[in-house]
Amino acid sequence: MKNIIRHLSKPAYREEFKGDTSPRTAAYISNRADASLGSTYKLPLEAKFWKMSIALICFLIVSSNCFASEPLPWQVTFQPPASPIMEELHHFHNFLLYISTAIVLFVAGLLGFVCIRFNAKNNPVPAKFSHNVLIEIIWTVIPIIILVIIAVPSFRILRHAEKIPETDLTIKVVGYQWYWHYIYPDHDNLEFDSVMISDENLKPDQKRLLDVDNRIVIPENATVRFLITAGDVIHSFAVPSLGFKIDAVPGRINETWTRVAKKGVYYGQCSELCGINHGFMPIAIEVVSKEDFDNWIASKNKTAMNGKNPKLAAN
């Protein structure tokens, strides 16, 4: 009723309904008052909705950078780099993004300019020239310069990845359908299989489709060389946060290296289609302190000596 009285006090309502106090008129005025009030609050509600949407998008983008070890739903960026090679790849990606964005904006702006400036309405008589030497030189030289600018850091990263420094630890990796076999030749040829943990055996703190029964364990700040091959078909040994993806080819040994300064567990997966269970070949690399690594080696060797490390049967 207060809404009706307030709106009736406006000049427009006083003139329109002067002297009319019937219930029908009162209901009509009430509906118009409610509609007016609704339109009054429409903008703040929309603003609140957009603020919440922007906040949610920012949360998804930022949260994707808060976890270094695993892929996340709705992740739109790389996993944060955990090795020297991945740090270089991350910077190179951002560098390429700036160049690509500039090219896209330039081409889109040029296309819009041409559509507006040289349409049939503005140019009823079309130009009759067939070529322009200066323009052709420009659009040939500029792409060459861009490619050279891109190639220099690209080759530098490739050289850094291929040139393996003096190593502190070597690990042999053998891919099978559908599990990984690891060998530590520097530690009495310690070897074990690594198999994905099934859903029924998964513990609350373990990650589905990523955790394994036996992880690779390496010490922090140690240069580790991986010698990679396969025993049946082609696989691919890939850990995104460490910046490597190396094919495991039967009869051939490929190699890569890494050095991780931060403790934690870093996950990867087989990245080469290798059969029906290709998607169930995760890789888990745990980085620990030097003391914990030595204790882990001693424990594994003791287990092997006691005969409690059975080989995985072919499946």
From Swiss-Prot:
InterPro entries: CcO_II, CcO_II-like_C, CcO_II_C, Copper_CuA, Cupredoxin, Cyt_c_oxidase_su2, Cyt_c_oxidase_su2_TM_dom, Cyt_c_oxidase_su2_TM_sf. It is an enzyme of class 7 (translocase). GO terms for cellular component: plasma membrane. Cu cation binds at H235, C270, C274, H278. Binds a copper A center. It catalyses: 4 Fe(II)-[cytochrome c] + O2 + 8 H(+)(in) = 4 Fe(III)-[cytochrome c] + 2 H2O + 4 H(+)(out). Belongs to the cytochrome c oxidase subunit 2 family. This is Probable cytochrome c oxidase subunit 2. The gene is ctaC.
